[in-house]
Amino acid sequence: MAFPETGPGSEPRWYHGDLIAENLLVRGGRLAAVLDFGGLAVGDPTVDLIVAWEVLDPASRDVFRRAVGVDETSWLRGRAWALSLALGTFPYYWSTMPDRCASRLAVVRSVLADAAATQ
């Protein structure tokens, strides 16, 4: 799976950079707060689409994608970011945070399943 090229809407913008389940507070089934702005930066905003694979099941991911209105190229870049960031977890946390590694392995599986479904 190649990293998709940039396209419309890929101009550098502010992004959170770490929209994972541990950084999202939900109350009453709705997003109440976002935590941990240590990764805040200016760059490819599609990095924040990782939330689709981090916390959503396939059906919810489809709803999210339609609600956000993201184009195909941006969606593919977001998916590539999700894979890249999930894989980067293993060397650092394999021995110390097995639960985090397990959740990132689930992200890798989701990304690969989505990629296979769109082949």
Q: Residue ranges of each PLM-predicted region?
A:
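An alpha-helical support segment within catalytic cores of ATP-dependent transferases
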Residues: 1-17, 104, 108, 115-119
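Pre-DFG segment of protein kinase catalytic domains
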Residues: 14, 33-36
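Adenine-nucleotide cofactor-binding loop residues
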Residues: 20, 38
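Hydrophobic residue at the +6 position relative to the catalytic HRD Asp in the kinase catalytic loop
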Residues: 22-24
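Activation-loop N-terminal segment of eukaryotic-like protein kinases
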Residues: 26-28
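Activation segment
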Residues: 32-33, 41-43
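Helix-rich C-terminal or lid/interface subdomains of diverse kinases
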Residues: 39-42, 50-119
